[in-house]
Amino acid sequence: MTGNVVVIGGGTAGMEAAGLLAKEGLKVTLIEKENEIGGHIKDWYHIFPDRRNSMEVIEYLRNKINHDNITLITGNTINGVEKKSGSFHISTVTGKEIRADAVLIATGFDLFKSERKEEYGYGIYDNVITSADLESMFRKGEVKLTDGEKPGRIGFIHCVGSRDEKVGNVYCSKLCCVTAVKQAMEIKEQFDEAKVFCFYLDMRMGGALYEELYRESQEKYGINYIRGKVSEVGVTISNKLVVKIEDTLAGRPLRMELDMLVLMAGMEMSDSGKLISETSNLKTGENRFFAPADHHIGSNKSNVKGIFYAGACTAPMNITETISHARSAVSDIVDYLRNGQ
C-alpha cells in the first residue's frame, strides 16, 4: 500500500510503530525531539520483570527502524498538526513543513519533577536522588554518596508525584512500585550489608511476574517494606538524612536516619505532548494525558480522524504494554488508509 505517515516521538512506541508501518510499504517520517532516539528506556540499566539489559530492547527497536521507507528527524519539536483537505500538515520549531496522510502521536511521558515536593529535599539535601538518577548510577557503575562513600542505609519513597492531590496528580503511575523493588534488589546486590527500606502507600504489583519479584525481594534480599506516607525529610549535623514517617500498619510514627534517599518519580504528560494538544485541538483527559476516542475499543484513536496515539502519551504504561499499543495503532492506521479518508 502507499501513503505517508508522520510518527511523532522516537521512543519505544514510536520506533516500534514506525518499523511496522514501513514494513507495510508506507513512507514514514519519524520525528524525535532529542538528538538521540530511544526515549526513556535508553537511560535505564536493567528492566523488569526479568531484569534484562535495556540495550537488548533498544537494539531490537533500532533494527526495526533501519528501513528504506523511514526518514528519521532528530533534535526537532513539533509546533502543531493541522488538517487541510483530508491531509495533515505538520510544522516544526525549525520551520520544516511535512505533509502526511495520517499522524501517529507517540510523545510518551515526562518524569515528575521531584523538586516540586519540597518536603522530600530533592535539590536541597545531598544524597536525595530520583529513580532516574539511581538508574544512571547503575549504568555508570558508580552508586555512591556525594562524599564518595558507599551507602549503608538506603530508603525509597514511592508515589512521588502520583496519587497526590497536592500536586494535582491523583492517578497511579503504575511502574513506581515495581521499579522500587527492582532498584532495591540491585542495591543489595552491590552492597550486601546495606539496609534497604521502601516507604509505600500501597504495593501495586499488577504486571506479569511483578508479584514474584516483590516476594523475591523480601525472601532473598531482605528488603524492608514500611507502609506509610513520609511527611518530612531533614538532615543531621553529621549530614545523615532523617525521614519522618507514620507507619500505618504498626500504628506509630517513625524517625529513621539514612545515607541515601531515592524518590520514585511518577509519570506526567510530556511537555511536547502538551504543546501538540494545545495547538492541534486534541482532547486530554482528567489525568491530562491524551484522551483516546474510547478506552475499550478505540484506545489508539483521537478525536481527530486520521490522528492516532501509541504508548504512554495516553496513560502510564510499561514497555510490554507500550509495544502492544504501538502494534494496535499500526493496525488502525493501515485500516484507515486502506479504506479511505
For the regions a protein language model found, what residue spans apply to each?
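Residues forming the flavin
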Residues: 1-341
